[in-house]
């Protein structure tokens, strides 16, 4: 059995593991790991470590509500962070600055998130920014990262003179790929 695994499955697994898209997904979701751990710890504490009397005390004292808010806030950003991280990682693998790509990916993620209207007002439900929107975040992160690097590597960008500070120049170089991704 080990021979079969080593000779047949390991080369396939190594090939899949070295794919740029898979690396970007791994790194992007790993970027959200602190939020996942913090949210999980707050959830464990809010439930009183599965001790009913401790859970009741936390609820009665009003502490559980704050813990749940922290947990929900942490888990509620996983999709957004993954979208940024996946685009960032994908772009970096092509030798391009990943931060603008990640920011554009955040914007496209918000563009595809449905808005709601009602008596309470207009807004964007946060449920899609959490794990419920993770699949969309993965797809958008991969597409944004690849398209962004393609624009930059094919010099489809606004070039500034050398006298312009590098941070400003990088911002201008992100305008064309960013606009194409956000509008497209």
Where are these regions (language model features)?
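Signature of multi-pass transmembrane helix bundles
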Residues: 1-37, 42, 51-55, 59, ...
């Amino acid at each position: 059995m080990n021979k079969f695994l080593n000779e047949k499955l390991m080369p396939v697994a190594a090939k899949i593991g070295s794919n740029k898209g898979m690396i970007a997904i791994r790194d992007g979701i790993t970027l959200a790991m602190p939020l996942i751990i913090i949210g999980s710890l707050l959830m464990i504490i809010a439930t009183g470590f599965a001790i009913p009397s401790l859970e009741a005390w936390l609820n009665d004292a009003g502490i559980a509500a704050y813990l749940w808010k922290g947990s929900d806030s942490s888990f509620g950003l996983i999709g957004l962070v993954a979208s940024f991280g996946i685009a960032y990682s994908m772009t970096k693998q092509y030798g391009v600055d990943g931060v603008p790509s990640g920011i554009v990916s955040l914007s496209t993620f918000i563009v595809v998130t449905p808005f709601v209207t009602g008596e309470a007002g207009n807004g964007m439900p946060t449920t899609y920014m959490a794990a419920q929107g993770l699949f969309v975040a993965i797809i958008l992160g991969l597409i944004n990262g690849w398209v962004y690097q393609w624009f930059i590597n094919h010099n489809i960008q606004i070039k500034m003179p050398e006298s312009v500070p590098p941070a400003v120049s990088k911002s201008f170089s992100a305008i064309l790929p960013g606009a194409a991704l956000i509008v497209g």
